[in-house]
A protein has these predicted regions:
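Extracellular loop and loop/strand-boundary signature of outer-membrane beta-barrel proteins
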Residues: 28-37, 76-81, 120-125
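Short, glycine/charged-rich beta-strand-loop motifs at protein surfaces that mediate ligand recognition
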Residues: 77-84, 91-95, 102
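Residue-level marker for the onset of beta-strands and adjacent loop->beta junctions
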Residues: 19, 46-47, 90-92, 102
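Residues that define the transmembrane beta-barrel architecture of outer-membrane proteins
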Residues: 3, 42-46, 86-90, 129-133
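Gram-negative outer-membrane beta-barrel transporters
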Residues: 1-73
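C-terminal beta-signal and adjacent terminal beta-strands/loops
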Residues: 65-74, 95-141
């Protein structure tokens, strides 16, 4: 009956910019200047998790952070009407190992039912995934 307590952290820094200027009739791009940030890419992303593992079961609590990003190309601070604000979402997962071939799984996404935005295109603001739960059977041979 040995327990493990793994902890993980991850960070991603994504610094984007267009290296050429161009114009597009597509509404998603418009006129691009050299040095404009590419839309819909968060500069900062972070995730962390802590788990409790045993020979028969696993429990994991994880959190993920996505930084603010712009929805149109541009430089400097992001105007509110072209911004999707940062968000943090917490998830929970579990697994019970029935035998060496079968496990029962359970997952809760967005444990605290956080309301957050993920997009503005097309047709306005779009929410992220609300609270959801699932159960399943995993087979391994």
């Amino acid at each position: 009956s040995k327990f493990k307590l793994p902890i993980t952290f991850g960070y991603t820094l994504t610094d984007t910019e267009f290296i050429n200027e161009f114009s597009s009739s597509d509404g998603a791009w418009g006129t691009i200047e050299k040095g404009d940030e590419i839309p819909y890419i968060s500069k900062h992303q972070f995730n962390a998790s802590i788990a409790l593992e045993h020979a028969k079961f696993e429990l994991i609590l994880g959190a993920r952070f996505n930084g603010e990003f712009r929805t149109v190309a541009g430089q400097g601070s992001i105007p509110n009407e072209f911004s999707v604000p940062n968000n943090t979402v917490v998830d929970f997962g579990s697994k019970y190992k029935y035998n060496k071939h079968f496990s029962l799984t359970g997952n809760i996404n967005n444990l605290f039912d956080t309301t957050y935005l993920v997009s503005r295109v097309p047709a306005g603001l779009r929410p992220g995934m609300p609270f959801s739960a699932s159960i399943g059977i995993a087979a391994q041979f």
